């Protein structure tokens, strides 16, 4: 354990370094404190949470939060550490970054889902497509289209291709995931972590620097617009993946490498302005946190000696599970924002906790009540869902969407009388709707009112329609 004087020396030493070295040293402190809890080192992390260097601050904030999650019970004996962590939320900038960090923690848990989507659906669909012809250079068109997709540029031709709608839908989903901040590059780069460069733990956390001897041959001096540099600046690459890309290029014969770089250059020619705009976006604070979390995910999931480290991604990442973290951000606005975020992720049970907490602090509105009800409905609790839908209906009467959800809940509970009431209200709003007529007929059958049901089905038959299952 450090004494205060030793911690002060380490702090002074770190502050004298360049920004990239500071960032690397803060990551080293995080790994150290993961292995052996040290209150002095935690105070050091809290200090760097307030630095003006964005890259350093993001690493210190991540380390401070994860360390608290790991050692929450010990913090009872160090009230100054809990207070120091709580005080971060008094700074509006840091409070915003804590929210970013919470969201990025949760997005990181979807990495495996994105990887399965690529490996099990998109790649096989591409390989089966007759529109991609193999030649001596490989699946050129496939690689170009996939690269566009991963950059967020959908190919309009996909939807025109016969039988390719599922492929287009899958690609759009992956594009949307990437835009939300979900890591869609893990599968591509996981095979590129076997280079000797990554045998050093430090290299998994080293900020990318094109002047490093291991990669400088990829960036020869005198080239004003290096295509690889432009690609790295504009792409959603974390620091570790940038090194992987350079290591891979270093393995290629110089003549082939030059040809590949030339091809990349020709593809981005004319799009320099757009790439510069994307590069500016990649420098914002959200991108800094996203990039670092991706570096961490790769280290804890792919490092050859990963079992020797405590994997923070295996812990519960929701701040509401931890006393101090919950108290730091417990405002109605934050609770609503996180509830909506969790709903988009289909984490309905956790979204309920956030929304019900928000309802304790502010007057309910129809939108919030609808969201709570929807979450209960999707966690197989239709009775609770109906309770909130009924309240929402009082605030927003004759709402077609609410009535649709209510009839589904009543149907799930076998309460066919109330289901019929909802269906008839919907029919008044949508006279002649085939599906509604069919649903009403089926509901009447459940109630044993067969003659009325038959009249509904005759109505469909008369109009040349059939019962919609």
Region spans (language model):
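Alpha-solenoid helical-repeat scaffolds
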Residues: 202-396
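Start-of-helix register in tetratricopeptide repeats
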Residues: 59, 333, 367, 400-401, ...
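Conserved structural position within tetratricopeptide repeats
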Residues: 357-360, 390-394, 424-428, 458-462
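Non-catalytic protein-protein interaction scaffold segments in large eukaryotic complex-forming proteins
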Residues: 96-99, 107-266
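Primarily a tetratricopeptide repeat
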Residues: 40-43, 47, 353, 387, ...
């Amino acid at each position: 354990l450090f004494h205060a004087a030793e911690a002060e020396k380490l702090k002074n030493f770190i502050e004298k370094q360049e920004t990239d070295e500071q960032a690397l040293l803060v990551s080293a402190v995080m790994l150290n404190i993961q292995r052996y809890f040290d209150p002095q080192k935690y105070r050091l992390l809290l200090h760097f949470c307030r630095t003006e260097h964005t890259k350093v601050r993001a690493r210190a904030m991540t380390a401070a939060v994860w360390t608290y999650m790991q050692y929450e019970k010990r913090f009872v004996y160090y009230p100054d550490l809990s207070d120091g962590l709580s005080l971060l939320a008094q700074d509006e900038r840091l409070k915003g970054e804590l929210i970013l960090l919470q969201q990025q923690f949760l997005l990181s848990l979807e990495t495996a889902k994105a990887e399965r989507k690529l490996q099990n659906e998109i790649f096989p669909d591409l390989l089966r497509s007759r529109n991609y012809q193999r030649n001596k250079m490989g699946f050129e068109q496939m690689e170009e289209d996939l690269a566009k997709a991963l950059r967020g540029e959908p190919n309009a031709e996909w939807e025109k291709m016969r039988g390719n709608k599922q492929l287009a839908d899958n690609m759009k989903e992956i594009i949307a995931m990437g835009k939300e901040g979900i890591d869609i590059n893990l599968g591509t780069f996981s095979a590129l972590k076997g280079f000797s460069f990554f045998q050093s733990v430090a290299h998994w956390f080293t900020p990318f620097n094109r002047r490093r001897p291991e990669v400088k041959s990829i960036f020869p001096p005198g080239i004003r617009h290096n295509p690889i540099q432009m690609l790295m600046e504009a792409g959603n690459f974390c620091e570790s993946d940038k090194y992987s890309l350079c290591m891979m290029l270093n393995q290629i014969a110089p003549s082939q490498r030059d040809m590949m770089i030339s091809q990349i250059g020709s593809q981005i020619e004319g799009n320099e302005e757009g790439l510069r705009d994307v590069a500016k976006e990649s420098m914002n604070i959200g991108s800094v946190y996203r990039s670092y979390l991706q570096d961490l995910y790769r280290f804890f999931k792919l490092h050859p000696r990963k079992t020797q480290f405590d994997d923070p991604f295996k812990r519960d990442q929701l701040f509401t599970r931890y006393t101090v973290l919950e108290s730091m951000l417990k405002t109605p606005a934050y609770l609503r924002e996180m509830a909506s975020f969790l709903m988009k992720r289909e984490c309905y049970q956790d979204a309920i906790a956030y929304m019900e907490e928000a309802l304790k602090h502010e007057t309910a509105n129809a939108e919030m009540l609808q969201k709570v009800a929807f979450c209960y409905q999707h966690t197989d609790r239709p009775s609770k869902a109906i309770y909130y839908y009924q309240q929402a209906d009082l605030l927003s009467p004759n709402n077609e969407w609410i009535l649709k959800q209510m009839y589904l809940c009543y149907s799930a509970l076998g309460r066919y009388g109330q289901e019929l009431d909802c269906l008839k209200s919907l029919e008044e709003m949508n006279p002649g709707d085939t599906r509604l007529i069919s649903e009403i007929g089926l509901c009447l059958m459940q109630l044993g009112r067969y003659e009325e049901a038959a009249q509904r089905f005759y109505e469909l038959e008369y109009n040349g329609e059939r019962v919609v299952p």
